[in-house]
A protein has these predicted regions:
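Acidic/histidine-enriched, glycine/proline-rich intrinsically disordered or flexible terminal extensions
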Residues: 77-117
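GST-like fold's C-terminal all-alpha helical module
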Residues: 1-66, 71
Length: 118
């Protein structure tokens, strides 16, 4: 019940942002911005736990899942170790609903682009 109330509140906040900003695209206030970065982890939780949200909220979640920067952020998080105990939850997880991971491999010659890219 409390999670449902929180989700309905999020839907109201996101709809209000769209009404005020009248964006032309998937993000809350036009171009991807700080508000969208703030809600990216929320979108990941909604998707990861298979929570039910309104169609417009689901479209916003799916925009995050398909965003290349979000996908890189998630991939980096997955390769940097175990979940910390304080963040581990006992909830059932669903298969990741976002796009499939892109095939990747470490470079064979040359210098890596940065410390994160092998």
């Amino acid at each position: 019940p409390e999670v449902e109330a929180d989700l309905r509140r999020l839907e109201l906040i996101w709809e209000h942002a769209r009404e005020v900003c009248a964006p032309n695209g998937p993000w809350l206030c036009g171009e991807y911005g700080i508000v969208d970065a703030f809600y990216a982890p929320v979108a990941a939780r909604i998707a990861g736990y298979g929570l039910s949200v309104s169609p417009s909220a689901q479209a916003y979640v799916e925009a995050h899942l398909a965003d290349p920067a979000f996908r890189r952020w998630r991939a980096m998080g997955l390769v940097h170790g175990e979940t910390l105990n304080r963040y581990a939850m006992t909830y059932d997880l669903t298969d990741w609903p976002g796009p499939s991971a892109l095939p990747a491999r470490a470079i064979e010659t040359g210098t890596p682009e940065n410390a994160t890219c092998p």
